Curated annotation (Swiss-Prot):
ATP binds at K18, S177, D178, T218, G219, G220, M221, A222, S223, K224. Its main location: cytoplasm. Residues 280-358 form the PUA domain. CDD domains: AAK_G5K_ProB, PUA_G5K. Its EC number is 2.7.2.11. Catalyzes the transfer of a phosphate group to glutamate to form L-glutamate 5-phosphate. Substrate binds at S58, D145, N157. This is Glutamate 5-kinase. It is an enzyme of class 2 (transferase). It comes from the Bacteria. It comes from Mycobacterium ulcerans (strain Agy99). Pathway: Amino-acid biosynthesis; L-proline biosynthesis; L-glutamate 5-semialdehyde from L-glutamate: step 1/2.
């Protein structure tokens, strides 16, 4: 009997496909439009079978290296951004040409972490991608490297693809790269590295040693593991597979490592609070408040707060930390920082009527 988690990938009606930089370049780091076209062929086959697909494509910086006459991937931020601005044109043109062979139109969607973190931009991005799919266009998503900073140096779109998967309500996420799947150690360095075909939860990753990014991109195994677990925790199954076997990955999911999704999909709002929103500050809780919030999923009352940090306002997302400063939850706060600083440690009966709401309502809390 086959794996039910691979079956979930096979039968998904909506899929986000993340294509890493190394999947689009030669071993020497040159952008290869031929490789991209081959991936488009595999993706087209899945779409022809009736699946909606959104592509998260890396490769803009790599695609800009040759046109700018650079000998290697730049290291300084300004040159990376210049290469990205040139390469993004070549990248999208290549995707456009590849899908034009099948009569399909592509749409470019450039995002930053800030766009995902801010609720209004988050919703607008969701609407744009949903509308592209409704119009039978292929959404090509990439990080907006020309204005991003840390985003260029970390992740190589792995985390972005997990966020987009939940953003569009995808049934599955497929990460295509230059690796066969997940091993308990780097197989290029350790001959006895053990292949892990299926991950049912974080406990399966105990003892796994994950490497960092390649010289062509920035997303190493650690980034892919983290992003796969993020998506799986939100209810989206993930397949980590080699781009060379994209056809098999997208047809029968018979290759790579599959990450099982949690049984209950996280709501869009709770996902945004937990993973996407930027934290505007933090609240330190006493032990009783931690038990109430984490153990019993109750609202946070001002009486359980011992410290307030940051300049936030009602409606912002804040971190909730225990007495040892470890984050235990995140939530949407109901009051400004200045108000909470005056309210903390006081029982509800001591507060004026307009200040008797919970500091963070249980419906706006997500344990971490």
């Amino acid at each position: 009997m086959g794996s039910p988690h691979r079956e979930a990938i096979r039968t998904a009606r909506s899929v986000v496909v993340k294509v890493g930089t190394t999947a689009l370049t030669t071993p020497s780091g040159v952008f290869d439009a031929g490789r991209l076209a081959e991936l488009a062929d595999a993706i087209e086959s899945r779409m022809k079978a009736g699946t909606d697909v959104v592509i998260v494509s890396s490769g803009a910086i790599a695609a800009g290296i040759e046109p700018l006459g650079l000998s290697r991937r730049p290291k300084d931020l300004a040159t990376k951004q210049a290469a990205a601005s040139v390469g993004q044109v070549a990248l999208v043109n290549s995707w456009s040409a590849a899908f034009a062979r099948y009569g399909r139109t592509v749409g470019q969607v450039l995002l930053t972490a800030h766009d995902i973190a801010m609720r209004v931009q988050h919703t607008n991005a969701q609407r744009t991608l949903d509308r592209l799919r409704a119009l039978h266009a292929v959404g090509i998503v990439n990080e907006n490297d020309t204005v991003a900073t840390n985003e260029i140096r970390f992740g190589d779109n792995d985390r972005l693809s997990a966020l987009v998967a939940h953003l569009v309500g995808a049934d599955a996420l497929v990460l295509l790269s230059d690796i066969d799947g997940l091993y308990d150690a780097d197989p290029r360095k350790f001959q006895n590295a053990r292949f892990i075909p299926e991950v049912s939860g974080p406990a399966d990753l105990d003892g796994v040693v994950a490497g960092q990014g390649s010289h062509l991109g920035t997303g190493g195994m650690a980034s892919k593991m983290s992003s796969a677990l993020l998506a799986a925790d939100a209810g989206v199954p993930v397949l980590l597979a080699p781009a060379a076997d994209a056809a098999a990955a997208l047809t029968d999911a018979s290759v790579g490592t599959v990450f099982a999704a949690r049984s209950e999909r996280m709501s869009a709002r709770r996902f945004w609070v937990r993973y996407a929103a930027e934290s505007a500050g933090s609240l330190t809780l006493d032990e009783g408040a931690v038990r109430a919030v984490v153990g019993h999923r109750r609202s946070l009352l001002p009486a359980g707060i011992t410290a307030v940090a940051g300049k936030f306002f009602g409606g912002d997302v804040v971190d909730l930390c225990g007495p040892d400063a470890t984050m235990v939850a995140r939530g949407v706060v109901a009051y400004d920082a200045t108000e909470l600083a005056a309210m903390m440690g006081r029982s509800t009966s001591e507060l004026p009527g307009e200040l008797r709401r919970p500091a963070v309502h249980a419906d706006d809390l997500v344990a971490v």
